[in-house]
């Protein structure tokens, strides 16, 4: 039986599935672009459910095309647009709001507030990041402050956060694995790079 490595390459404008053989040579690629949403100036959003559906359908497509099944897969890797932020209901898997993309600038005002409060050194020393709307933490704050469903789910202890890799892993495993890795976590402005743990 032929064996392959499957890579989910979830980018800013498209999702792609790549199969590599055991020599790490590309065997096949399938790809699909998805819609970008620009509801206000400086805002950029994605539909995380659409991304999940595309990834799932692309995996099915590459399996059908090459007459493969899960037994042909050695392992799965995920690359993604790291700072893009998804918050979802852990019971249903449904996002409470569209994914806020790394390019989005809606949290600039909150960032300026943190800078005025002299939080730059504290945050930099813990995360290695400058205060900027580019990173996930300020996007999370915006969703919690502006989406009533998010606050409701926090009270019920049913709100999950993740970068896109985390959301896809959670969906791929039927809601059993809520994980990311240090490379993604370190772009959230919530991860302490000295302790290699989420900061409090």
For the regions a protein language model found, what residue spans apply to each?
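N-terminal glycine/serine-rich phosphate-binding loop of ATP-dependent small-molecule kinases
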Residues: 1-97, 109, 125
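Gly/Ser/Thr-rich active-site cleft segment
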Residues: 10-12, 123-200
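A broad, structural surface signal
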Residues: 49, 53-60, 64, 112, ...
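Short, glycine- and charge-enriched coil/turn segments that flank and shape catalytic ligand pockets
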Residues: 64-71, 92, 118-120, 148-159
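Acidic/polar active-site rim loop that often engages polyanionic ligands
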Residues: 90-94, 117-127, 143
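Carbohydrate-associated surface elements
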Residues: 104
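Flexible glycine-/small-residue-enriched beta->alpha junction loops
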Residues: 110-117, 132, 138
């Amino acid at each position: 039986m032929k064996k392959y490595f499957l890579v989910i390459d979830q980018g800013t404008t498209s999702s792609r599935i790549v199969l590599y053989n055991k020599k790490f040579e590309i065997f096949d690629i399938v790809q699909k672009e998805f819609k970008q949403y620009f509801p206000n100036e400086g805002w950029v959003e994605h539909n995380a459910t659409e991304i999940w559906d595309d990834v799932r359908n692309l995996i099915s497509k590459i399996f059908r095309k090459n007459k493969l099944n899960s037994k042909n897969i050695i392992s799965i890797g995920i690359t993604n647009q790291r700072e893009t932020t998804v918050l979802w209901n852990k019971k249903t898997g449904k996002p409470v709001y569209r994914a806020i993309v790394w390019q989005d600038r809606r949290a600039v005002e909150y960032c300026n507030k943190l800078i005025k409060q002299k939080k730059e050194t504290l945050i930099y020393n813990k995360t290695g990041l400058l205060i900027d709307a580019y990173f996930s933490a300020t996007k999370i704050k915006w969703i919690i402050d502006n989406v009533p469903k998010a606050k409701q789910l926090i009270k019920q202890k049913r709100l999950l956060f993740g970068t896109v890799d985390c959301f896809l892993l959670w969906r791929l495993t039927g809601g059993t694995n809520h994980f990311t890795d240090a490379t993604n976590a370190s772009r959230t402005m919530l991860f302490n790079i000295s302790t290699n743990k989420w900061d409090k």
